[in-house]
């Protein structure tokens, strides 16, 4: 089978699935990314880098400009995909990130392919003031509509997610060998001046994160806070604050994978203004390193992380006192650290969950083929 991957980076979050498909010699695989180190390679995979937007007239971050830029990048990618087709590479299956400009016209290039997209979590409130976030959400809606299968990788077991139009939810695969604690016993250490990670996915949540950090610092004077935001716009906002941030709050520059892993290994706790602000990769990779999540939200939505899962849950108004209390109890925190690591090893270990992802994709494509041929999908 010919398989085309399309993602922001190479290989990014699709790396475990890519490696699993590449290990099966019957597949011919091409990976198209917007960014990626050209010297990096995966055996059995051909990698191409899609050109960035060439327009110099599209300046700004407003919704209109962001949408124009997305359409232009989608058209440029369409040209690249048509050249692939002319070269003889016509994929049987396309796997791509959903909120991706380069996937906007994937159906125009490969109308006969089975298309599966990996959806992001639904955005937080605040899209009215976040042009890039709004366009990303619109791109995701478009991609979900034109896909034959929608998959959401989450800190949950396998379910069908009715909140995202019947998307299939699968456990996010974590490389537990790489994301592992520094301590031999698997628990993170808790010393004076404990490091606390405050992390959010979207730029719209940065200001809430700042308020949380300042409130925690007022109660725990000796803790060290590190602020992380996954979106480029959010990182830019934090960088602009720079020296104006209170002492004790650190904002790292863009991190390499090793630097990111090492940061997780030195943290005692990870938190966010609300549980929904955290992405599954950051949450689970932190837990795999023995970092204890202290989260505000409804724990019933995260059953694997609830009873005995290594997390502390509370109401939004209790978040700062709960964080302060956790940091004052190193013995209890060490127990939770071990439990957090065990939860990831039990439910999200890459070697255990990826076979299920492969099986689902093969089953979904087989059902799709039967439907295309006029048969039944049962």
Residue ranges of model-derived segments:
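Acidic anion/phosphate-binding donor-loop and adjacent secondary structure
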Residues: 174-192
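Membrane-proximal helix-turn-helix segments that form the acceptor-binding/catalytic region
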Residues: 129-150, 157-158
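Nucleotide-activated donor-binding/catalytic signature segment of Leloir-type glycosyltransferases, i.e.
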Residues: 229, 235-261
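Carbohydrate-associated surface elements
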Residues: 156, 173
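Acidic donor-binding loop of glycosyltransferase active sites
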Residues: 148, 265-278, 291
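Short hydrophobic beta-strand element within catalytic cores of glycosyltransferases
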Residues: 292-296
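Conserved donor-binding/catalytic core segment of Leloir-type glycosyltransferases
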Residues: 188-205, 210-213, 217, 226
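A short, well-ordered alpha-helix in the C-terminal region of glycosyltransferases
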Residues: 332-347, 353-359
């Amino acid at each position: 089978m010919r398989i085309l991957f399309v993602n922001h980076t190479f290989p990014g979050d699709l790396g475990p699935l890519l490696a699993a498909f590449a290990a099966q010699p019957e597949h011919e695989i091409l990976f198209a990314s917007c960014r990626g180190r050209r010297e990096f390679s995966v055996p059995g995979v051909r990698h191409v880098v899609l050109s960035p937007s060439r327009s110099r007239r599209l300046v700004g971050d407003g919704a209109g400009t962001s949408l124009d830029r997305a359409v232009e990048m989608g058209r440029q990618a369409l040209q690249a995909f048509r050249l692939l087709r002319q070269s003889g590479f016509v994929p049987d299956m396309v796997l791509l990130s959903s909120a991706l400009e380069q996937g906007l016209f994937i159906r125009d290039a490969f109308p006969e392919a089975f298309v599966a997209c990996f959806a992001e979590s639904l955005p937080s409130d605040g899209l009215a003031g976040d042009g890039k976030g709004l366009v990303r959400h619109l791109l995701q809606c478009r991609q979900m509509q034109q896909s034959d299968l929608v998959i959401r990788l989450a800190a949950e077991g396998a379910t069908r997610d009715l909140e995202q139009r019947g998307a299939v939810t699968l456990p996010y695969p974590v490389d537990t060998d790489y994301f592992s604690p520094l301590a031999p016993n698997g628990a993170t250490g808790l010393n004076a001046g404990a490091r606390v990670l405050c992390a959010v996915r979207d730029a719209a949540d940065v200001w809430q994160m700042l308020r949380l950090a300042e409130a925690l610092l007022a109660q725990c004077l000796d803790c060290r806070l590190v602020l992380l935001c996954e979106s480029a716009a959010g990182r830019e906002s934090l960088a602009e604050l720079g020296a104006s941030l209170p002492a004790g709050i650190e904002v790292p520059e863009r991190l390499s994978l090793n630097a990111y892993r090492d940061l997780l290994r030195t943290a005692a706790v990870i938190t966010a203004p609300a549980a929904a602000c955290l992405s599954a990769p950051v949450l689970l990779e932190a837990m795999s390193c023995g970092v204890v999540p202290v989260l505000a939200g409804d724990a019933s939505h995260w059953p694997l992380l609830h009873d005995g899962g290594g997390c502390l849950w509370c109401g939004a108004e209790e978040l700062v006192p709960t964080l302060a209390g956790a940091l004052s109890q190193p013995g209890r925190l060490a127990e939770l650290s071990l439990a957090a690591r065990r939860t990831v090893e039990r439910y999200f270990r890459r070697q255990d969950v990826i076979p299920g992802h492969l099986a689902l994709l093969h089953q979904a494509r087989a059902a799709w083929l039967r439907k295309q041929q006029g048969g039944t999908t049962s």
